[in-house]
Regions:
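Extended active-site neighborhood of metal-dependent phosphoesterases/phosphodiesterases
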Residues: 49-121, 154-157, 163-167, 185, ...
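Active-site-proximal beta-strand elements of phosphoester/diester hydrolases
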Residues: 1-10, 96-106, 130-133, 187-193, ...
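Residue-level marker of motif borders
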Residues: 2, 38, 67-68, 91, ...
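His/acidic metal-ligating clusters that form di-metal
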Residues: 26-37, 111-188, 217-220, 228
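Active-site environment of divalent metal-dependent phosphoester hydrolases
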Residues: 11-13, 45-51, 73-80, 107-110, ...
Length: 235
């Protein structure tokens, strides 16, 4: 079982963000049975300050299982790698699942891209796989969100790649601060709600990303009968 947290946006002096992540960590740490690992799918820090990552590490410390991270558009990749002492792209086992992370960030931009050529050789292990990236490779119907997403050409290239890798059972993402379900080339795409603020559904083009009072949450991904089942857990 893989637990997924996303988008805590920890900022120095922001007690509410720290408390929200602390609550999420406590909930995951108390799960029985315990997850095999935890994924934090981007925007760990709000400004990319190295001191924010030190705080994130402290807040994640109560988790007794391995914690895996990947960068979001608010993160500084070099600072994140230094804080967690590992590259942001890696392949690792999480119980019966294989977790493959992809860095979709573009320095200085909020949108993303998928480095398909770099990803292709990393998918050769036939173990049931979850592909994790910050930006979700789907169209949400919310114009302000879609403006900060993945280009269609990149999504098409990824779909072509996944057609040759049927062991990729799920794509999981963050970035959107809402739980959503879609698909890319027949592979289900799941977006995790934020551990902090949630974004409102604004289907009309406003140019803004308003928040709302929806509860934060996390996700659990389980391999059952050869397929991945994902659960949304509100906090």
């Amino acid at each position: 079982m893989l637990a997924q947290l996303s988008d805590p946006h920890i900022r120095l002096g922001d007690r509410a963000a720290a408390d929200a992540l602390r609550t999420a960590v406590a909930a995951v740490a108390a799960l029985d049975p315990a997850p095999d690992a935890v994924l934090v799918s981007g925007d760990l820090a709000d400004t990319g300050d190295p001191r924010e990552y030190a705080l994130v590490r402290d807040l994640l410390q109560p988790l007794p299982m391995p914690v895996h991270v990947l960068p979001g558009n608010h993160d500084d990749v070099a600072a994140l790698e230094a804080a967690f002492d590992r590259p942001v792209e890696y392949e690792v086992d999480a119980g019966p699942l294989r977790l493959v992370t992809v860095d979709t960030t573009i320095p200085g931009e909020d949108g993303g891209r998928i480095p398909v050529d770099r990803l292709a050789p990393r998918l050769n292990d036939p173990k049931p796989t979850i592909l994790a990236m910050h930006h979700a490779p789907l169209t949400t119907g919310v114009p302000a969100m879609d403006a900060l997403g993945i280009p269609l050409a990149d999504r098409a290239a990824l779909a072509d790649l996944l057609a040759h890798h049927p062991h990729v059972k799920r794509i999981v993402s963050g970035h959107l601060h809402r739980a959503m379900v879609g698909a890319l080339g027949g592979v289900p795409v799941f977006t995790c709600p934020g551990a902090n603020l949630q974004l409102a559904l604004a289907f009309r083009a406003t140019g803004e990303l308003p928040t709302n009072d929806d509860p934060p949450g996390y996700a659990l991904h389980l391999l059952l009968d050869g397929e991945v089942t994902s659960h949304l857990v509100p906090l």
